[in-house]
Amino acid sequence: MVSDFFFPQPGGIESHIFQLSQRLIDLGHKVIVITHAYKDRVGVRYLTNGLTVYYVPLHTVYRETTFPSFFSFFPIFRNIVIRENIEIVHGHGSLSFLCHDAILHARTMGLKTCFTDHSLFGFADAGSIVTNKLLKFTMSDVNHVICVSHTCRENTVLRAVLNPKRVSVIPNALVAENFQPDPSKASKDFLTIVVISRLYYNKGIDLLIAVIPRICAQHPKVRFVIAGDGPKSIDLEQMREKYMLQDRVEMLGSVRHDQVRDVMVRGHIYLHPSLTEAFGTVLVEAASCGLYVISTKVGGVPEVLPSHMTRFARPEEDDLADTLSSVITDYLDHKIKTETFHEEVKQMYSWIDVAERTEKVYDSICSENNLRLIDRLKLYYGCGQWAGKLFCLLIAIDYLVMVLLEWIWPASDIDPAVDRVSSTFKISKQNFDESLVLTDPKKKTKIKTACLKDAQ
């Protein structure tokens, strides 16, 4: 698994990679994760079930994405892949340059590749044009592509000019046991609306800023709980100050993923004002916690939950405010029942199912033959009149770099890594102490604390 987005940063892609890796390990596969360093988290870390994570010291430029390195990442990537005896490289995220680099190097080394797209992009603005061209470059020689929704699949096929037969739809999921409802935590005096999101423009925070004062004026018994961080947090604070809503709009800042459920069970309604969304795992988590979901009707959101669990609004201030006001009235009149939501969601979404479907994709690409270099160059040449020639040059240089690395540091000289996936890493409350063969109680306590911190 390769992506710029992984723990300790919270988010949907991060959670997807971790949970999918855990379930694949349970199915008997060896899985490692390659990501960039996060502050002092550098080097190799071992997480739950012996999941090995390589935090590579690379510089980030924007929203935790690394600067495109192309060839400078190749030596360490090659070393990791050979050490761990990797056969399939699975990248995540269109905006992850680390993912794109890894897929290109993996194909040069003759490895099988898979890519999962978690986002939707347009076709008109400059940022989308550059991203789409980069995606087309990388996807020209990828073995298979996975999308998290049918809307995302259509978007990715158009952006990367892919054969639809090479693109599958496998949704996100959740661990339902970690998102159980608790009605006793919700306020009896107020109707609480929860928002958990990164506070960026594309997440619809401007809509949220416009809607909150209107709803608070119309419904005196409503309050908001907002969790998340980002550049729009300043605008939210200013809105709170302007309308004097400090006692009705609570801002929690960034929360860890293991704290999301504790925030959700404080509410009755979950509001999701995003302007673009490929799937929206947080919607499933909210419904599992027994919250009624209100969301903008964008992207793959309509595919996520059945109609009795959610209500949609256009991504406009007036329509979102009217829809939210209508749901609040229905909720106060006891017309909305959420008692069965958790069991329904538990039956609909499972990481085991996601892992088994992903495993079938892996099996299918393992039977494919690797292309010769000349055939790969033909695929890249079709990426555009000028871009095609540039991409061919990059691939040719990448091949020469691989030959040079093999001459300087032959694969036979790279020591294989120890297989860490064993029962001693399957830590539970009952057998944790027994899994650590240490005689010093003080050292055992320190290691226990460190391991639990990493596992979180």
Curated annotation (Swiss-Prot):
KW Electron transport (keyword) present: no
EC number, as in UniProt: 2.4.1.198
Catalysed reaction, written as an equation: a 1,2-diacyl-sn-glycero-3-phospho-(1D-myo-inositol) + UDP-N-acetyl-alpha-D-glucosamine = a 6-(N-acetyl-alpha-D-glucosaminyl)-1-(1,2-diacyl-sn-glycero-3-phospho)-1D-myo-inositol + UDP + H(+)
Pfam families: Glycos_transf_1 (PF00534), PIGA (PF08288)
InterPro entries the UniProt entry points to: Glyco_trans_1, PIG-A/GPI3, PIGA_GPI_anchor_biosynthesis
Quaternary organization: Component of a Phosphatidylinositol N-acetylglucosaminyltransferase complex.
Role this protein plays: Catalytic subunit in the complex catalyzing the transfer of N-acetylglucosamine from UDP-N-acetylglucosamine to phosphatidylinositol, the first step of GPI biosynthesis.
Gene Ontology process terms (BP): GPI anchor biosynthetic process
Family membership: Belongs to the glycosyltransferase group 1 family. Glycosyltransferase 4 subfamily.
Species for this entry: Schizosaccharomyces pombe (strain 972 / ATCC 24843)
GO molecular function: phosphatidylinositol N-acetylglucosaminyltransferase activity
Domain of life of the source: Eukaryota
Name used for this protein in its record: Phosphatidylinositol N-acetylglucosaminyltransferase gpi3 subunit
Keyword Transferase recorded: yes
One Gene Ontology cellular component annotation held by this UniProt entry: glycosylphosphatidylinositol-N-acetylglucosaminyltransferase (GPI-GnT) complex
Pathway(s) per entry: Glycolipid biosynthesis; glycosylphosphatidylinositol-anchor biosynthesis
Keywords: Glycosyltransferase, GPI-anchor biosynthesis, Transferase
